[in-house]
Amino acid sequence: MNRSLMSLLGREGLGEKITDATPLPDTAETIHISSLALLKMLQHARAGVPLEVMGLMLGELIDEYTIRVIDVFAMPQSGTSVSVEAIDPVFQTKMLDMLKQTGRDEIVIGWYHSHPGFGCWLSSVDVNTQQSFEQLQSRAVAVVVDPLQSVRGKVVIDAFRTIKTSPTAEPRQITSNLGHLQDPSIQALIHGLNRNYYSIAINYRKNELEQKMLLNLHKKKWTEGLIVDKFDTHEQSNEKQINNLLELTKQYQKSIQDEDKIEPEKKEVSAVGKLDPKRHLISDVHTLMANNVVRVLTVMLDTVTF
């Protein structure tokens, strides 16, 4: 309801007459993005910072209300402002032919590009690019991802489609999508959200293989324990830790001497907000001994094995 009212207000601001037959944006669809596609989009977007990058999305149209994005691939275009260059048709054709040889028979259902640091919305050039996609596929989608605002556990991403100025087909009935769409930002509203284009709900699906892939993404291997640092690096690390232990020892000795000068009723609050040298000294000694014991055993094992 809020998005409908905002759309009507936006059209009224443009001087359009509001009637009962005025078509509203169709936001009933849901885009299901696979984990592989999401990871590849984020990796490509972060590699291109501070420039914008773009790519194409491969997937399938499940039904009238569901679009599934299975995979993506990067395009050689990049941009320096809030827009990217046009699509390279030669590169796109060659890439699709090579993907078909690997078993990727999905069609191009849209494109994605990055907005590093300034949110998810479409510029005027992006709207024109999206309209060119919709001429080939009426249900094409434009996905925008912000790699700088994205943090672990929360990805700043949104999907858009342009609003037809003079639709010929009757708009279909849709259900409420309240709670599924992201709240629009002020910057997106200024740049034409709900006026030139509208947002589409995004969902993330994970099958059994994708769950295993995500679990093994940063999984450590047992062979990492056999890796030995350089002797010069290890010597410098030991020297730094020993100097730190010497400094903590002096602080601990000074704290013991100061305890005799402090009144008994003030001893409980005298150490509040200060570094506890005794606790840090014990922790650093255990860490230093454990690291050196593990290193000696690793060097002995490597010498005998190799």
From Swiss-Prot:
InterPro entries: JAMM/MPN+_dom, JAMM_MPN+_peptidase_M67A, MPN, RPN11_C. This is 26S proteasome non-ATPase regulatory subunit 14. GO terms for molecular function: metal ion binding; metal-dependent deubiquitinase activity; proteasome binding. Zn(2+) binds at H113, H115, D126. SMART domains: JAB_MPN (SM00232). Gene3D superfamilies: Cytidine Deaminase, domain 2. Component of the 19S regulatory cap of the 26S proteasome. One of its GO terms (cellular component) is nucleus. Belongs to the peptidase M67A family. PSMD14 subfamily. Residues 31-166 form the MPN domain. It is an enzyme of class 3 (hydrolase). One of its GO terms (biological process) is proteasome-mediated ubiquitin-dependent protein catabolic process. Its EC number is 3.4.19.-. Metalloprotease component of the 26S proteasome that specifically cleaves 'Lys-63'-linked polyubiquitin chains. The 26S proteasome is involved in the ATP-dependent degradation of ubiquitinated proteins. The function of the 'Lys-63'-specific deubiquitination of the proteasome is unclear. A motif (JAMM motif) lies at residues 113-126. Keywords: Hydrolase, Metal-binding, Metalloprotease, Protease, Proteasome, Ubl conjugation pathway, Zinc.
